[in-house]
């Protein structure tokens, strides 16, 4: 009886790796069908949506055909001259792809859950602003930073090899291979590799491929880096009494006589911190220039030999924090030395000494924000506010609410920057653009609009309750910053500026 239970448990554990029974469940494709309808909304004609009914028998037949690469259905393109039939096939193929993605997501979630449970000290936070307090604490103690852009030029067979680690059934792998190779034939050779990750039409499948790829990278890369920096030590540089601290190390740590105290500093005081958002990763290092070069060397060879792809040199850049600034999540980040006056009392004597500390200064890119506002027709190139003509057909409340949301989102995202005066200038531009838009709609002047609306223009739009008052801003310390914990994604303005930075680096 015990042997039978062991065999049954073994059969259940092996069955978790087989996904093909889920492909023949009708409720799975019903969920995918409803998900696709929710995403499409009312953008498609009603007659096309009505004609797309879900057939369980046709789903099974289509999957059986998709397993054969020589006779697979088209998931990413149709050449049928009948527009209605073409839309139906395209819509139905997307439903199959959504169902396949749901199956992979469930299996991936189970695998990643066990991986996260096995890691000690793993914290998952939703807000991206949780990265900035971490960098405020850790970056001032670092002297080098490596700005890494995760490469996305990966071959489809490498993705199949990644999934083969936790998918044991051949039909699911053949289905995935046929989808990826059909995707490969649907794009030009130049845009193929980027389309595998950043294709717009199949967002759910694309995001799943990207997350799986990044998960595979970090699951091997982070332990490799931890092995390279084998010990996480205290920040000895933060202690004023450095001489006596070295003497304590000498008494505690056993080391050969040939190694001097300076070499102990290099060996024991090395640490690394890693953060990532999207394709951008930052590794802050406390060590020597030789250690940074070795880490860069290992990163190059990791992607070259493990993923069989060429890692472009511009995708990893090592900077010295005390000399240069870098951009991340729409901020300019710069570590600046700050002197502190400290009073030390010894017996009856009082001494005044100076301490040099490092402080992280996040700066909002005001020029990039002005360029974006000029592109969206809120102001001209010189920063002079203009009316938003495309919004004149809206009601007054909608116009005020739209300007209000733009400003609130912008200020909440850049609330931790040190150049708050630039944000006040952006507020002035949006306020005048809002007034000019209302004046253009009512065919009047800004003065007439302000007289008609009165304080409503300033209370409903850009309300003072949602903005930090000037009295509080003056009384608070310059070292204190307010990071909004409700920011779950990068601001569109910051994302636009970040894409401009990436294009400049690639060119």
Swiss-Prot record:
Coiled coil: none annotated. GO terms for cellular component: chloroplast. InterPro entries: Domain_X, Maturase_MatK, Maturase_MatK_N. One of its GO terms (molecular function) is RNA binding. The keyword RNA-binding applies. It comes from the Eukaryota. It holds the Pfam family Intron_maturas2. Keywords: Chloroplast, mRNA processing, Plastid, RNA-binding, tRNA processing. It is found in: Plastid, Chloroplast. Transmembrane segments: none annotated. One of its GO terms (biological process) is RNA splicing. Usually encoded in the trnK tRNA gene intron. Probably assists in splicing its own and other chloroplast group II introns. Belongs to the intron maturase 2 family. MatK subfamily. This is Maturase K. It comes from Cryptomeria japonica (Japanese cedar).
């Amino acid at each position: 009886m015990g042997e039978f239970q062991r065999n049954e448990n073994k059969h259940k554990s092996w069955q978790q790796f087989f996904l093909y029974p889920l492909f023949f469940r009708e409720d799975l494709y019903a969920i995918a069908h409803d998900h696709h309808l929710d995403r499409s909304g009312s953008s498609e004609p009603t007659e096309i949506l009505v004609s797309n009914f879900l057939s369980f028998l046709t789903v099974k037949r289509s999957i059986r055909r998709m397993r054969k690469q020589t006779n697979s259905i088209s998931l990413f393109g149709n050449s049928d001259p009948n527009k209605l039939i073409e839309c139906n096939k395209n819509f139905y193929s997307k439903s199959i792809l959504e169902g396949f993605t749901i199956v992979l997501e469930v299996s991936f979630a189970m695998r990643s859950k066990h991986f996260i449970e096995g890691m000690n000290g793993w914290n998952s936070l939703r807000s991206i602003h949780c990265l900035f307090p971490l960098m405020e604490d850790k970056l001032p103690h670092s002297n080098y930073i490596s700005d890494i852009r995760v490469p996305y030029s990966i071959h489809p067979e490498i993705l199949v090899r990644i999934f083969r680690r936790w998918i044991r059934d051949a039909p699911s792998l053949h289905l995935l291979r046929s989808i990826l190779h059909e995707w490969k034939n649907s794009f030009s050779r130049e845009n193929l590799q980027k389309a595998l990750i950043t294709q717009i039409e199949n967002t759910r499948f694309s995001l799943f491929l990207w997350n799986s790829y990044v998960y595979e990278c970090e699951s091997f890369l982070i332990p490799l880096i931890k092995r390279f920096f084998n010990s996480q030590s205290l920040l000895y540089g933060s202690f004023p009494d450095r001489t006596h601290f070295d003497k304590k190390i000498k008494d505690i740590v056993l080391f050969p006589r040939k190694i001097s105290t300076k070499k102990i500093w290099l060996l024991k005081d090395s640490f690394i911190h890693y953060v990532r958002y999207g394709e951008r990763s930052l590794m802050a290092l406390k060590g020597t220039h030789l250690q940074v070069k070795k880490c860069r060397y290992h990163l190059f060879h990791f992607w070259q030999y493990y993923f069989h792809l060429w890692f472009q040199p511009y995708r990893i850049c090592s900077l010295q924090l005390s000399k240069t600034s870098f951009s991340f999540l729409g901020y300019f980040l710069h570590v600046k030395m700050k002197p502190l006056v400290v009073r030390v009392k010894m017996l009856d004597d009082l001494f005044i000494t100076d301490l040099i500390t490092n402080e992280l200064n996040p700066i909002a890119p005001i020029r990039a924000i002005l360029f974006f506002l000029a592109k969206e027709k809120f102001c001209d190139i010189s920063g002079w506010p203009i009316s938003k003509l495309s919004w004149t057909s809206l009601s007054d409340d909608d116009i005020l609410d739209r300007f209000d949301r733009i400003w609130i989102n912008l200020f909440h995202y850049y609330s931790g920057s040190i150049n708050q005066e630039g944000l006040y200038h952006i507020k002035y531009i949006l306020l005048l653009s809002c007034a000019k838009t209302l004046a253009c709609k009512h065919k009047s002047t800004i003065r007439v609009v302000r007289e008609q609306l009165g304080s409503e223009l300033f209370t409903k739009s850009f309300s003072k309750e949602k903005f930090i008052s000037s009295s509080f801003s003056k009384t608070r310390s310059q070292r204190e910053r307010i990071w909004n914990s409700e920011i779950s994604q990068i601001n569109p303005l910051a994302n636009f500026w970040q894409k401009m930075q990436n294009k400049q680096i690639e060119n």
